[in-house]
Amino acid sequence: MTKAPIAGNRTGRKLGQRVKNKKMKASSRQWLQRHINDPYVQRAQLEGYRARAAFKLLEIDEKHHILRGAKRIIDLGAAPGSWSQIAAKVTGSTDEDIRVAAIDFLEMAQLPGVKILQLDFLDPTAPEKLLEAVGGTPDLVISDMAAPTTGHHRTDHLRTMHLCEVAAQFAVEVLGEGGHFLTKTFQGGTERELLAMLKQNFRQVVHVKPNASRAESVEMFLLAKGFKGRKVEGDAEKA
C-alpha cells in the first residue's frame, strides 16, 4: 500500500482546486491534483483514516460481512495502516490485549491495539512471528500487498499473483474454521491453481471491485469465505 499521512488535510486545499507548480513534472502534478480532489481521500482525512483504502475494506464488508464477529485479524502489506485501524476497532484490540497483527516491509507509524512487524512477508520467519504477535488463531487474513510496479503489465501481474498465492497458502495454514481471506489482485486472469486451491478450502470464492477502487485501476480483490478447516492426518489417510 502507498504510504500516506496519518490524518488531516496537510495540503490545505479544497476539493476541486488545481495544483500549480512550474517545477513539478506534468505527470506528478496530475497525480497530486487527482489525489487532492479524490472524495475518498477527503473522507479518509475527515474520518481519521490513514489512507483511502479504508473504504475499500468497509465497502467489501458492507456486502460480504467479513469483519462481523472477527476476534483476531492479520493484516498483510499493512502500511500505512488504514485496514489495521478498522481491524483494531472491530476486534476491540488494545495494547494490553493485542488482537491485530500487521506486517509490511515499509515503516509504519504505531497504532493502538496493533502489533506491527516491519518485515518482508516473504521472509521465512514472518508466518511464525505473525501468529505469535496476534496471540491466537485468526478469524480473518486480509492482504493489500502488491509488488512494486515495473511498468510492464505482465511482469507486474505475475509478481503480485505470487504474493496472492503465498498469502492464500498462509491463510489456509493459520485460519480457524469458518474464517475468511481477502487479497488484492490485478485484473488479467487469476491463476487457475490459486482459484482451485481456494475453492477446495473455502465455501465461497468471489472477485470484488469496490467503488473505492479507482475506475481506471486494474486492481480488484479476491475474497474467500468460510474456511472449511484443515484435514487432520488421519482424515487424509482415510480419503
From Swiss-Prot:
Entry keyword S-adenosyl-L-methionine: yes
One Gene Ontology molecular-function label: rRNA (uridine-2'-O-)-methyltransferase activity
SUPFAM superfamilies: S-adenosyl-L-methionine-dependent methyltransferases
EC number in record: 2.1.1.166
InterPro entries documented for this protein: RNA_methyltr_RlmE, RNA_MeTrfase_FtsJ_dom, rRNA-MeTfrase_E, SAM-dependent_MTases_sf
Gene3D superfamilies named among the record's database cross-references: Vaccinia Virus protein VP39
Keywords: Cytoplasm, Methyltransferase, rRNA processing, S-adenosyl-L-methionine, Transferase
Major location (coarse): cytoplasm
Catalytic activity of the protein: uridine(2552) in 23S rRNA + S-adenosyl-L-methionine = 2'-O-methyluridine(2552) in 23S rRNA + S-adenosyl-L-homocysteine + H(+)
Function: Specifically methylates the uridine in position 2552 of 23S rRNA at the 2'-O position of the ribose in the fully assembled 50S ribosomal subunit.
Protein name, UniProt field: Ribosomal RNA large subunit methyltransferase E
Underlying gene: rlmE
